[in-house]
């Protein structure tokens, strides 16, 4: 990460990460496809109505895993083995605790939260059942994500991908067996998701236990070290809050979609899942930017940091443009994978028509905060993202949307919020970058040799 051609290493790092994200999203996609094709639009709406709400609950802790990733990358690059080991064991312990807490919270408050979102009576019982079963698997979900974050910090993106391939195949097979064979509908797809997440969790923990070096996991050493937890929180909590608040605005958006009825909910579910594949593709580049920036920042290579950001911008815009245009032109064909009902497909196409082509803006919007988090600056990007993304969407939902009630007009809030956030994040990055340069006399001063992987 700290030497050699940047673009080649970015691609080799980000591509397995992209595939991992796509496979993880496939858990939800297979759920949606199976219930949409074999259980009908109401079951599809029931599963889809929980997506934004689930993200509101869990993304705080997933965001904190970014803090573990940044801290571990920094210690690994600097060859600080004891600090690396403490970070690993603190992160895994935190994952276990947060997973158990989220399981209890999700099971207890699922129905009440869905009622607050205005979930229609004809789907709320199935939505509640799906959400409660899904949350029972939170400990497995958290442990996998934190374990994978540690592996990514040391440059290993291939093994998490392999683990997801295995668990994804299990998930798909169980979905077909439980829904088609046993007619369990939404309960069946939720159970399949839990089992597959358990498999990926076991595989990543086994990998960490069997590895040699500073990031080896020992269950006997699992504990919370307050000093390292504080450092993880410094980067992770702002990232988690940002993601949680953004998904809260998406939950408000889901509530607005709910007002159009089950058909619109099903169309949004299919379209939103498709947009999710676009997001994980550009987000993998953001995560690569964060990891590369963190390692180069830790060894004082500030000029190389600039090149990392520029190459990430080129890569992100290119990927988003190709995928976004493909989704725009072939949206109807893709949506038929999720459902055969023409009205549902029409609603999905209405949403895709305004969100897919400008999706490159979303990739740009996330890159600058990713670079800043890699440098250890997380609070200000979080505040700016909340103001730009959440503020704009809430303003749109409560002020502009009532003037013209249509799905197309509602989802103009997406590109509008992306553009507003980009402007603020670019200005923030400029001033933080200037502050970093002023702190050193020679930005390209070579420090002692890095221990970073891929050097």
Where does each model-flagged region fall?
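Helix-terminus/linker motif at the lipid-water interface of multi-pass membrane proteins
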Residues: 26-45, 114-121, 177-184, 244-277, ...
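Hydrophobic alpha-helical transmembrane segments in multi-pass membrane proteins
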Residues: 13, 17-25, 62, 94-103, ...
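Short alpha-helical transmembrane segments in multi-pass integral membrane proteins
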Residues: 1-14, 72-137, 181-237, 293-358, ...
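Transmembrane helical elements of multi-pass membrane transporters/channels
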Residues: 12-31, 133, 167, 196-200, ...
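Hydrophobic transmembrane alpha-helices of multi-pass small-molecule transporters
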Residues: 56-59, 171-175, 201-205, 277-280, ...
């Amino acid at each position: 990460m700290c030497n050699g051609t940047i673009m080649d290493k970015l691609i080799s790092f980000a591509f397995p990460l992209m595939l991992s994200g796509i496979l993880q999203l496939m858990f939800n996609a297979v759920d949606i496809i199976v219930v949409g094709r074999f259980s009908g639009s109401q079951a599809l709406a029931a599963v889809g109505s929980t997506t934004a709400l689930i993200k509101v609950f869990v993304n705080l802790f997933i965001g904190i895993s970014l803090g573990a990733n940044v801290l571990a990358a920094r210690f690994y690059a600097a060859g600080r083995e004891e600090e690396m080991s403490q970070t690993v064991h603190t992160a895994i312990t935190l994952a276990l605790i947060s997973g158990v807490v989220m399981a209890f919270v999700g099971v207890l408050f699922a129905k009440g939260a869905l009622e607050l979102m205005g979930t229609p009576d004809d789907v709320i019982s199935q939505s509640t059942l799906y959400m409660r079963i899904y949350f029972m698997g939170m400990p497995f979900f958290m442990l996998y994500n934190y374990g994978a974050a540690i592996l990514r910090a040391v440059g290993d993106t291939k093994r998490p991908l392999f683990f997801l391939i295995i668990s994804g195949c299990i998930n798909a097979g169980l979905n077909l067996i439980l829904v088609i064979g046993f007619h369990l509908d939404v309960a069946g797809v939720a159970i399949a998701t839990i089992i597959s997440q358990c498999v990926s969790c076991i595989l990543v923990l086994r990998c960490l236990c069997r590895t040699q070096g500073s990031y080896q996991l020992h269950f006997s050493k699992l504990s919370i070290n307050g000093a390292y937890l504080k450092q993880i929180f410094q980067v992770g909590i702002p990232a988690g809050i940002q993601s949680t608040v953004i998904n809260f605005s998406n939950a408000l958006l889901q509530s607005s979609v709910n007002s159009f009825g089950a058909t619109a909910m099903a169309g949004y579910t299919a379209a939103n899942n498709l947009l999710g594949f676009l997001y994980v593709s550009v987000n993998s580049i953001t995560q690569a930017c964060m990891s590369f920036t963190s390692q180069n920042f830790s060894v004082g290579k500030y000029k190389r940091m600039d090149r990392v950001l520029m190459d990430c911008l080129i890569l992100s815009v290119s990927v988003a443009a190709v995928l976004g245009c493909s989704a725009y032109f072939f949206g109807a064909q893709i949506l038929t994978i999720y459902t055969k009902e023409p009205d549902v497909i029409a609603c999905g196409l209405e949403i895709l028509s305004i969100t897919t082509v400008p999706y490159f803006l979303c990739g740009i919007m996330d890159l600058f905060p990713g670079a800043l988090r890699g440098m250890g600056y997380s609070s200000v990007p979080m505040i700016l993202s909340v103001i730009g993304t959440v503020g704009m969407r809430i303003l749109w939902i409560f002020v502009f949307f009532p003037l013209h009630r249509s799905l197309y007009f509602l989802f103009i809030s997406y590109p509008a919020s992306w553009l507003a956030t980009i402007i603020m994040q670019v200005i923030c990055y400029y001033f933080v970058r200037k502050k970093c340069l002023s702190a050193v006399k020679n930005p390209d001063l070579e420090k002692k040799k890095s221990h970073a992987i891929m050097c």
